[in-house]
C-alpha cells in the first residue's frame, strides 16, 4: 500500500519525469554544441594546412637563397679559372707568364678589358714557348690561329717570344695621335705666342710713350709765365734782405 501511495504521489508523476528528462537532454545538447565550437576554433587556430604552407614557403626561400649563392660562387670561380689571368681592382684583367728562356722570370703581358682576352694572350705566350706541350685555357688550334693572324710580330728573331708578344700588346694599348697632335699644337702655338708677345711689347711701349707725352703736355699747360717789372736794384736788395 505504501508503495502504491508513493507511486501515486506528486514525486513520481509523469509531468515531473518528462520535465527532468527534457532538462537533461537540453543540457547534453548544449554541452555538445560547446564542445563542437571549441574543437572548430582549436582546429582553425592550429590548422595543419597553414603549417604546411609556412614550411613550404620557408623551404622554397631557402632553396632560392642557396641557388643564388651557388650562382655567385660559380661566377667567381669562372672568373678565376683562367690560367695566368689576374683581375685588377678597377675591373681590368692582367695577363702574366713565367718566361722559361729568361730563368723563369715573371713577365707582364698587358692589361685587357675582358678575362677571355687576357687568357688568350697568356695562351699565345705559352704556346710560343712550349708549343703543344703548353697547358692552355683554350684549344691549341684556336691559339695557333690567333698567332697566325697577328701582324708585325716575329717570334723567331732570337729574343724571347714573350717579349715580342708583350711589345705587340703594349703597342695595341698605346693611344695613337696624341704625340703628333701635341707637337703640332706646340708648333702652331709658338708663332702665335711670339706674335702676341711682340704685339704686347709694342703696345706697352706705345702706352709708355703716350703717358710721357701726356705728362709733358699737362706740365706745359699747368706752367704760367710771370713777367716782373724792373723796379730797380734798390728794391731788389730790400727783397733779398727781407727774405734773409
From Swiss-Prot:
- Localization, UniProt: Nucleus
Q: Which organism does this sequence originate in?
A: Arabidopsis thaliana (Mouse-ear cress)
List every stretch annotated Disordered.
1-22, 166-219
Question: Entry's PANTHER family?
Answer: DNA-BINDING DOMAIN, ETHYLENE-RESPONSIVE TRANSCRIPTION FACTOR ERF094
- So what family is this one in? Belongs to the AP2/ERF transcription factor family. ERF subfamily.
The protein's GO terms of the molecular function aspect are: DNA binding; DNA-binding transcription factor activity
Composition bias of kind Basic residues appears in 166-181
Pfam entry (one): AP2
Q: Which GO terms describe its cellular component?
A: nucleus
Biological process terms in GO annotation: ethylene-activated signaling pathway; jasmonic acid and ethylene-dependent systemic resistance; response to ethylene; response to jasmonic acid
Where's DNA bound on this chain?
81-139
Among Gene3D superfamilies, the record links this protein to:
AP2/ERF domain
Compositionally biased spans, kind Low complexity = 8-22, 182-208
List the InterPro entries: AP2/ERF_dom (IPR001471), AP2/ERF_dom_sf (IPR036955), DNA-bd_dom_sf (IPR016177), ERF_plant (IPR044808)
Q: What is this protein called?
A: Ethylene-responsive transcription factor ERF094
Function of this protein?
Probably acts as a transcriptional activator. Binds to the GCC-box pathogenesis-related promoter element. May be involved in the regulation of gene expression by stress factors and by components of stress signal transduction pathways. Acts as an essential integrator of the JA and ethylene signal transduction pathways. Activates the expression of the PDF1.2A gene.
Alphabetized, the UniProt keywords read: Activator, DNA-binding, Ethylene signaling pathway, Nucleus, Transcription, Transcription regulation
Amino acid at each position: 500500500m505504501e508503495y502504491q501511495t508513493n507511486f501515486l504521489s506528486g514525486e513520481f508523476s509523469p509531468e515531473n519525469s518528462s520535465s527532468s528528462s527534457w532538462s537533461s537532454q537540453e543540457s547534453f545538447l548544449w554541452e555538445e554544441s560547446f564542445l563542437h565550437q571549441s574543437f572548430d576554433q582549436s582546429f582553425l587556430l592550429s590548422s595543419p594546412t597553414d603549417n604546411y604552407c609556412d614550411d613550404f614557403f620557408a623551404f622554397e626561400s631557402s632553396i632560392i637563397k642557396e641557388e643564388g649563392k651557388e650562382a655567385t660562387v660559380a661566377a667567381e670561380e669562372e672568373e678565376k679559372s683562367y690560367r695566368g689571368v689576374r683581375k685588377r681592382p678597377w675591373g681590368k684583367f692582367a695577363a702574366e707568364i713565367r718566361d722559361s728562356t729568361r730563368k723563369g722570370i715573371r713577365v707582364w703581358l698587358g692589361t685587357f678589358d675582358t678575362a677571355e682576352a687576357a687568357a688568350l694572350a697568356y695562351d699565345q705566350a705559352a704556346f710560343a714557348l712550349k708549343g703543344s706541350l703548353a697547358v692552355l685555357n683554350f684549344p691549341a688550334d684556336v691559339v695557333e690561329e690567333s698567332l697566325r693572324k697577328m701582324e708585325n710580330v716575329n717570334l723567331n728573331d732570337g729574343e724571347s717570344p714573350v717579349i715580342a708578344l708583350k711589345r705587340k700588346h703594349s703597342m695595341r694599348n698605346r693611344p695613337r695621335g696624341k704625340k703628333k697632335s701635341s707637337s703640332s699644337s706646340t708648333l702652331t702655338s709658338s708663332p702665335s705666342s711670339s706674335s702676341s708677345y711682340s704685339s704686347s711689347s709694342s703696345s706697352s711701349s706705345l702706352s709708355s710713350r703716350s703717358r710721357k707725352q701726356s705728362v709733358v703736355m699737362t706740365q706745359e699747360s699747368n706752367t704760367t709765365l710771370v713777367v716782373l717789372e724792373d723796379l730797380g736794384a734798390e728794391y731788389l736788395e730790400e727783397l733779398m734782405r727781407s727774405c734773409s
